[in-house]
């Protein structure tokens, strides 16, 4: 489990903008990284759309939003185009960042346990420190909660 006030683990993943995203090269700003199970599913679509609606407000606070799932770049591009998502989505097919950030683990649904992506959001400051984690996220109003927290710490 990732801890608040710890150094953000470094990773490099392919991005929907056809470039690699390296966390250590993006620390000139706050980063709101959200891990989600799958493109084009109801909860994940709502979460992406909610962050997209508030994207300009995050940008005004010098915060970039990044979504990460195991989906391919091709899937991410279709998802971005379909729902007009203004931020990058990263493909973590090998579960590099998912595991480093504790977003991969045991889940349960309808009484069955299985391994999967746990909906998680991490807020990182420009010094590379994790300042807040949200685990087992409920989508409704989550993006507003992240934005409000960011406003409090700036």
Predicted stretch roles:
Residues 1-154:
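Chalcogenol-based redox active-site neighborhoods
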């Amino acid at each position: 489990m990732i801890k608040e006030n710890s150094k953000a683990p470094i990773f490099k993943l392919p991005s929907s903008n056809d470039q690699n995203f390296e966390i250590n090269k993006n620390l000139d700003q706050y980063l709101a990284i959200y891990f989600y199970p799958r493109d084009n599913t109801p909860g994940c679509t709502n979460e992406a759309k909610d962050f997209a609606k508030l994207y300009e407000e995050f940008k005004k606070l010098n915060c970039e939003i990044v979504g990460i799932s195991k989906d391919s770049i091709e899937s991410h591009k279709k998802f971005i185009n379909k729902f007009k998502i203004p931020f990058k989505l990263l493909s973590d097919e090998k579960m590099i960042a998912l595991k480093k950030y504790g977003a991969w683990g045991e889940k349960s649904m309808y009484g069955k346990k299985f391994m999967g992506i746990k909906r998680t959001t991490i807020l990182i400051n420009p010094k590379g420190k994790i300042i807040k984690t949200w685990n087992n996220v409920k989508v409704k109003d989550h993006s507003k909660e992240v934005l409000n927290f960011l406003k409090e710490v700036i």
